[in-house]
């Protein structure tokens, strides 16, 4: 299966979540520090995690039905594999080149494109997960247009 790798934009990533970036409000002043809550969750308590990604292929995707999850690249290059909540076979792959937040229930996994990649993750403390295993590992390949 060949899946084209994309760079996330507000438009092409909207159905999976959002890109964490400044807004009109946070850019509204050249001299004052601005703060804006971009997303939240009804559940209590969040955890922050540091993920070192070394795998170059994915054996499965998982979802967190009741939790959003942020992926914030720190070092190296990795790819984010995602699929809609109700269509886990409809995979898309994005370069994780900016911080993003996944909606609740979006199927996902990450694989390294560089030798290893480091990612900061934030998600609900009591997160629950569901996993779907692929028949064969999915190994993204960069191709020319």
Residue ranges and their predicted role:
Residues 94-115:
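Conserved metal-binding segment of the jelly-roll/cupin
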Residues 1-94, 114-116, 122-136, 141-145:
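Non-catalytic, conserved peripheral segments adjacent to functional cores
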